[in-house]
């Protein structure tokens, strides 16, 4: 006999939408300096975002004080929720008092890159409370720390709206949003996403396919989030906080050129580089 469902709570298996903070050095001073350099101009950018500390890039004999790293992340207003570690690291990783998490390839299974045990550069990962960790993510640069962008969690394959009053029209692989998105709202589409209103600062649109925005883009736009390198972003006015395709991203810390800022543009990937080109609509 199966237990009767409780009207008060429910326990379910699920994934968590979070960032991965990939540690590649044991030098906390260098790590602190790099965080300051990258985020001091935009202190609110990752404010209150959850983050998992990923230590799988460290050598077998290297350890880091995870409690101090958690405090360091808190200083830039991130919220550490756990640690991603190899099985050989579990002993010391447990000492920080943070839960051990599993970062999996969002397409399912393990993602093997060009070298054994590595993923391709810049790919995001969904985080879930499982003990068997996936291989470490490779780095696209020589930076001391690496931020990976999140995959939005979802249930039953349905597109998500983070607030009431947003109308979602879905036709096969295309999701249409006919209202402006305010700060804090988030939309996820399994295929292409079309937005007819403004995406405000602090709002976020995420799609596994292309993103089309027929209004100013001032928040975040993440296309091709399951590793689709052919995805593109189109918008009629580019003023974005962040743009990303297949996990390769650009933020406001790198100002947009004058010929594309506030202009109609298309954005795509050329190998591992984001390309931004003005759209000539007339």
UniProtKB/Swiss-Prot annotation:
The gene coding this protein: minC
Record's keyword terms, sorted: Cell cycle, Cell division, Septation
Compositionally biased spans, kind Low complexity: 122-140
Gene source species: Paraburkholderia phymatum (strain DSM 17167 / CIP 108236 / LMG 21445 / STM815)
This protein's name: Probable septum site-determining protein MinC
Subunit structure: Interacts with MinD and FtsZ.
Compositional bias annotation for Basic and acidic residues: 102-115
GO biological process: cell morphogenesis; division septum assembly; regulation of cell division; regulation of cell septum assembly
InterPro entries recorded: CAP/MinC_C, MinC, MinC_C_sf, MinC_N, Septum_form_inhib_MinC_C
Annotated function: Cell division inhibitor that blocks the formation of polar Z ring septums. Rapidly oscillates between the poles of the cell to destabilize FtsZ filaments that have formed before they mature into polar Z rings. Prevents FtsZ polymerization.
Region Disordered, residue ranges: 95-142
Family per record: Belongs to the MinC family.
NCBIfam families to which the protein is assigned, alphabetical: minC
Tagged with keyword Cell division: yes
């Amino acid at each position: 006999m199966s237990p009767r469902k409780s009207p008060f709570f429910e326990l379910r298996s699920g994934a968590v939408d979070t960032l991965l903070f990939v540690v590649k050095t044991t030098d906390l001073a260098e790590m602190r300096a790099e965080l300051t350099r990258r985020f001091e101009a935009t202190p609110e950018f990752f404010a209150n975002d959850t983050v998992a500390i990923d230590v799988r890039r460290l050598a077998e004999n290297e350890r880091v004080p995870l409690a101090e790293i958690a405090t360091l992340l808190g200083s830039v207003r991130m919220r550490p929720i756990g640690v991603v570690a190899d099985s050989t690291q579990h002993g010391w990783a447990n000492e920080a008092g943070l839960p051990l998490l599993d970062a999996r390839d969002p397409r399912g299974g393990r993602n093997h890159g060009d070298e054994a045990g590595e993923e391709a550069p810049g790919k995001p990962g969904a985080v879930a409370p499982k003990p068997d960790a996936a291989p470490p993510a490779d780095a696209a640069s020589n930076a001391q720390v690496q931020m990976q962008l999140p995959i939005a969690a979802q249930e039953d394959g349905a597109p998500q709206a983070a607030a009431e009053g947003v109308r979602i029209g879905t036709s096969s692989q295309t999701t249409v949003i006919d209202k402006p998105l305010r700060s804090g709202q988030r939309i996820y589409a399994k295929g292409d996403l079309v937005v007819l209103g403004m995406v405000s600062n602090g709002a976020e649109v995420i799609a596994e396919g292309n993103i089309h925005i027929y209004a100013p883009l001032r928040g975040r736009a993440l296309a091709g989030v399951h590793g689709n390198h052919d995805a593109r972003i189109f918008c009629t006015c580019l003023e974005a906080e962040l743009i990303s395709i297949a996990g390769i991203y650009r933020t406001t810390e790198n100002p947009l050129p004058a010929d594309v800022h506030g202009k109609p543009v298309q954005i795509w990937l050329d190998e591992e580089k984001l390309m931004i080109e003005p759209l000539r609509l007339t």
